[in-house]
Amino acid sequence: MPDGRSETVSGDTGQAAGVQNKKIGFLSFGFWRDVPGSRARSAADSLLQTIELAQAAEEIGVDGAFVRVHHFERQLASPFPLLSAIGARTSRIEIGTAVIDMRYENPLYMAEEAAAADLISGGRLQLGVSRGSPEIALRGAESFGYVPADGESAADNARRKTEIFLAAVNGAAVARTDPERTGISGGLAIQPQSPGLADRIWWGSGTRATAQWAAAKGLNLQSSTLLTEDTGVPFDQLQAEQIRLYRQAWAEQGWAREPRVSVSRSVLPITEDIDRR
């Protein structure tokens, strides 16, 4: 198992109004360190052990295998090759992210990669996206070539890219044909398309407002462990309020399906003396 913190992810399927069919999964950061006691000393160790962990989790009945995505750090960063490998080695367990920082993404290329990973897995991808968590890089996304528009906040940038990604996943025309090559003028959608993927996109939310925004866009909700609107009440109550507002906003939109909601809790497995140290 990759070193470092893991989290359990629990969510309801939302398959029927008023019914909470709960599922449980794991969320791995995939840390690796070449230090005494480490069982994941390299990136290869972390990646391969994450695949093995997902296989083992499926065997014992765990419902989901999720990974964190952080850049410029010794942990998992590029999720789609990993998710595709997990999808090819498993048959039932859901696979996904919590979350992909959209500031670092080309939303159209990401739509291609997401569809490919979903098709490889047989439609098991549960993709969490968001603004991302605090990071060690200063303007890291700009190092990738993604510079926000003048006056655009990091959060607005992530939401704008998410909307482009959603349109592409839903099959919208995002380019035009070249009449000189095709003899026609028309729209082009990203290929491949994976039916049903659009209903399996989640937004990682740390505030009430972004949870309501997610509902307005038809996104499932990944409630963050870093809720930023501290009102003096215990965390579980604050999180419950966020989820209630999300469900209310979802109902007001009149979406045909029921949404899914997930929460996560940190777990430190202690099985040996070395773990205690």
Predicted regions and their residues:
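N-terminal beta1-alpha1-beta2 module of alpha/beta enzyme domains
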Residues: 2-93
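An alpha-helical appendage that flanks or caps ligand/catalytic pockets
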Residues: 2-20, 150-190, 223, 232-277
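Flexible, glycine-rich active-site loops centered on histidine and acidic residues
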Residues: 10, 19-43, 104-174, 229
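Acidic (Asp/Glu)-rich catalytic clusters
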Residues: 18-19, 58-59, 83-92, 114, ...
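Hydrophobic faces of well-ordered beta-strands that scaffold small-molecule active sites
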Residues: 24-28, 65-67, 94-98, 125-129, ...
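Active-site mouth loops of central-metabolism enzymes
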Residues: 32-48, 100-108, 195-205, 268
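Acidic-and-aromatic substrate-binding clefts and catalytic sites of carbohydrate-active enzymes
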Residues: 71-78, 102-108, 229-234, 269-271
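A conserved active-site cap/scaffold subdomain adjacent to cofactor or substrate pockets
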Residues: 209-237
